Amino acid sequence: MGDAALRAKWDRASRLYDWMTWGDIHRFGPAKRRLCMAMQGRCLMVAAGTGNDFRCFPPGLDIVAIDVSSEMVAQARIKAKAYDGVLEVRQMDICALDYPDGTFDTVVTACTFCSVPDPVRGLRELRRCLKPGGRLLMFEHVRSRIGPIGLLQDLMTPITRRFGPEMNRDTVGNVLRAGFDIEREENVYLDVVRTITARRPDTA
């Protein structure tokens, strides 16, 4: 999928995005808040969508939130006004971040890498923009290691990718391939929804 098609896909999705994700917001909000408690320093949130996860951020931080969709960004900017801290929302592609190397202390993702067309490239770009020792905090849908569930995800993915995520991504493997060290994994729902804490090595 080209860049223009990707933007158009998420522009269309923005119209019903809050309605489609209402259940997840309430179901997974506590897990996201626990993950976000580790945010520190200058922070980047990628694929922010309409900004529903802004409520999970600790107060008083300096945060940039990006999304590829101009329609998502427009809605997210409205929600950003309620944040108790600095929260700038920009339209930007995760695979071409307009920031110098080592800009951020923390990067946050929430259901992001089930949708990025080239996930390893996107993760390498996040690694570039993190300071050495900086942390990547991820809340993601991943492919199950339980055989029947993983197979079901494989069968569902050709359908789900038409309107949003790919359900069978090996996100943990992709994080390692991008050059991160994984510090912690935690299952949130079975092993399909998972939090991952990773770190950019100090010497790389």
Q: What do these predicted ranges mean?
A:
Residues 1-40, 52-53, 75, 151-158, ...:
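Conserved class I S-adenosyl-L-methionine
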Residues 4, 20-24, 137-195:
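C-terminal alpha-helical "lid/dimerization" subdomain adjacent to the S-adenosyl-L-methionine
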Residues 44-96:
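Class I SAM-dependent methyltransferase SAM/SAH-binding core
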Residues 62, 133-135:
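Short glycine-centered segments of the SAM/dcSAM-binding site in methyltransferase folds
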Residues 95-107:
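A short acidic, Gly/Pro-enriched loop at the edge of an enzyme's catalytic core
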Residues 106-118:
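A short SAM/SAH-binding and catalytic strip from SAM-dependent methyltransferases
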Residues 120-132:
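A short glycine-rich, Lys/Arg-flanked "PGG" loop and its adjoining helix->strand segment in the class I
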Residues 196-204:
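C-terminal lobe and adjacent flexible extensions of AdoMet/dcAdoMet transferase-like proteins
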